[in-house]
Amino acid sequence: MFSNWNIFLNYKNFTINQEIKNKLNLYYQILIEENQKYNLTRITELNEVFEKHFLDSLLFVEQFQIIDQKIADIGTGAGFPGIVLKIFFPNIKLTLIESNNKKVNFLKYLVQKLNLNDVEILNKRAEELNEYKEQFDIVISRAVAYLNIILELGVQLVKVNGMFILLKGPKAYQEIKDLKNKDQKMNLKLINIQELEDTGFGTRINLFYKKINHTNNLYPRKYQQILKESK
């Protein structure tokens, strides 16, 4: 059982109570029990999971308030950051997007065990979700792909005036440079950069893009085409 709850008290815009603590402990227990079956994470030590996965999933909330928005998490894997957000902000409407079948099975089991409501799990690739075009207030992704790839994969899902939030590491500035204004072509505007330095989880650079107009029908292209251009 985790006990160092003080690590969650140094940040604004989210609070922690006993119900949240219980769910996070259960989340950890399920994650470790199922990890060998599903290959979910290389980080398994208790304190590391709570800091490098759970807390790291929340750091962007310092800069952007979460209340009851409709949120899509692209490439959620073991549920980071989406499930963590749902535990702390139960009023959000959450869609988890994951193309790996085994991880989808884990997510379904996890959502059931945590007794989470208003969670949709899609076993698809983000660029294939044409029926979800401009449906989400927030699209978020944590360490899934290079910036010029992930922006194109997910841009169609974001509402006009909605946010595309990317949880990144120390290479984020180089990735921004490599975009070569591709974000502007997709009607995305970088409105905020959050920099965090901590010995526990290293350098974190979170990017906040606002969608300022509808997505051009050119985007997203087929994944292999996006990938080929990015090389």
UniProtKB/Swiss-Prot annotation:
Question: What Gene3D superfamilies does the record point to?
Answer: Vaccinia Virus protein VP39
InterPro entries on file: rRNA_ssu_MeTfrase_G, SAM-dependent_MTases_sf
| Keyword field | Cytoplasm, Methyltransferase, rRNA processing, S-adenosyl-L-methionine, Transferase
Q: Where in the cell is it found?
A: Cytoplasm
Q: What does this protein do?
A: Specifically methylates the N7 position of a guanine in 16S rRNA.
Tell me which family the UniProt entry assigns to this protein. Answer: Belongs to the methyltransferase superfamily. RNA methyltransferase RsmG family.
**NCBIfam families noted in UniProt:** rsmG_gidB
Write the protein's name.
Ribosomal RNA small subunit methyltransferase G
What organism is the protein native to?
Mycoplasma capricolum subsp. capricolum (strain California kid / ATCC 27343 / NCTC 10154)
**Gene it is expressed from:** rsmG
